[in-house]
């Protein structure tokens, strides 16, 4: 092989070949003539990679999730059954024996029980008016006042007290009106003074007096309260005793039935005064005699 100088350039190398040669052809020849050790190492690396298993592109489900699904499938489903279907009783009875020691009831519960008992007692001790309101029959009320010079106008029970008004004729300036009350059929009695009520219209020939009398305490269950109105003027005494029957206050259990009014006033026989107005309104509104909604009592004229 001829000797080649070390000072050769690329053009001189290409001129060395007998036929026309490109530089890329020379590079390929040098690459193909690489040392055998390097070529074997590259082939070994390629062979090792070809033996590894291929990984799938789709990932499988998580193992923990698969185990949970399998456990749920293995669980037994719950079922409901009734006692009678198994021959058992549908009800259960428990018997409790009395305690040897007395139970200690809290104070607030004891107080509540006492209040309930007291309310029941108060309900039994309620009183009612056992007479018709005098002013319910206005014509009769006016005639009685003209004839007897005194007449109970109206009254009602309020908080264990009897309150009302009395109408009297203005016979003189000095006059006194009182309520005489008893709870033992007049074996004993007590007088309660009435107070003068100033008339709205001056120059009237009639005066009005009011009273507020507390009912006696400790009245026997079989006893009733009776009262009458006394009017004193210029040494003369006038009485309104409900036409001799007295005004009575009775307990709830001794109250006369509601047909009491029908025996005293017949709705068919209602009288009419000279002005054409009905003389009796009690047959239309009988509940007014015990109505406790009137806070202000006053005269009708």
UniProtKB/Swiss-Prot annotation:
Single GO MF annotation: protein phosphatase regulator activity
Record-linked Pfam families: CBM_21 (PF03370)
Keywords: Carbohydrate metabolism, Glycogen metabolism
BP GO annotations: glycogen metabolic process; regulation of glycogen catabolic process
Highest taxon listed in the record's lineage: Eukaryota
Location of the motif PP1-binding motif: 79-82
A GO CC term attached to the entry: protein phosphatase type 1 complex
Record-annotated CBM21 domain positions: 142-250
Keyword RNA-binding in annotation: no
Matches recorded under InterPro entries: CBM21_dom (IPR005036), CBM21_dom_sf (IPR038175), Pase-1_reg-su_3B/C/D_met (IPR017434), PP1_3B (IPR030682), PP1_regulatory_subunit_3 (IPR050782)
Role played: Acts as a glycogen-targeting subunit for phosphatase PP1. Facilitates interaction of the PP1 with enzymes of the glycogen metabolism and regulates its activity. Suppresses the rate at which PP1 dephosphorylates (inactivates) glycogen phosphorylase and enhances the rate at which it activates glycogen synthase and therefore limits glycogen breakdown.
Quaternary assembly: Interacts with glycogen, PPP1CC catalytic subunit of PP1 and PYGL. Associates with glycogen particles. Forms complexes with debranching enzyme, glycogen phosphorylase, glycogen synthase and phosphorylase kinase which is necessary for its regulation of PP1 activity.
Free-text comment on this protein's domains from its UniProt entry: The N-terminal region is required for binding to PP1, the central region is required for binding to glycogen and the C-terminal region is required for binding to glycogen phosphorylase, glycogen synthase and phosphorylase kinase.
Protein name, entry field: Protein phosphatase 1 regulatory subunit 3B
Species, as recorded: Xenopus tropicalis
Encoding gene per record: ppp1r3b
């Amino acid at each position: 092989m001829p000797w080649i100088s070390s000072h050769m350039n690329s053009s001189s190398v290409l001129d060395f070949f007998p036929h026309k040669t490109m530089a890329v052809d020379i590079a390929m020849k040098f690459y193909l003539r690489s040392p055998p050790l390097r070529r074997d190492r590259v082939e070994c690396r390629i062979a090792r990679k070809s033996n590894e298993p291929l990984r799938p592109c789709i990932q499988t489900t998580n193992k923990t999730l698969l185990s949970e699904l399998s456990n749920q499938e293995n669980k037994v489903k719950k079922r409901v059954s009734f006692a009678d279907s198994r021959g058992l009783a549908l009800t259960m009875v428990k018997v409790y024996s009395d305690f040897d020691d007395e139970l200690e009831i809290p104070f607030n519960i004891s107080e509540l029980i006492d209040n309930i008992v007291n309310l029941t007692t108060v309900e039994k001790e309620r009183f009612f008016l056992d007479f018709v309101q005098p002013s319910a029959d206005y014509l009769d009320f006016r005639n009685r006042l003209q004839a007897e010079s005194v007449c109970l106008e109206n009254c009602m029970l309020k908080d264990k007290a009897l309150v009302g008004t009395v109408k009297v004729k203005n016979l003189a300036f000095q006059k006194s009106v009182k309520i005489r009350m008893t709870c033992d059929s007049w074996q004993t009695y007590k007088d309660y003074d009435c107070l003068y009520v100033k008339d709205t219209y001056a120059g009237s020939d009639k005066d009005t007096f009011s009273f507020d009398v507390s009912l006696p305490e400790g009245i026997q269950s079989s006893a009733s309260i009776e009262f009458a109105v006394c009017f004193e003027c210029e040494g003369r005494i006038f009485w309104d005793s409900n036409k001799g029957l007295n005004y009575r206050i009775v307990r709830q259990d001794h109250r006369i039935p509601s047909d009491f009014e029908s025996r005293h006033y017949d709705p068919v026989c209602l009288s009419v005064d000279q002005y054409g107005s009905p003389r009796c309104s009690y047959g239309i509104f009988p509940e007014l005699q015990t109505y406790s909604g009137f806070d202000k009592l006053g005269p009708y004229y």
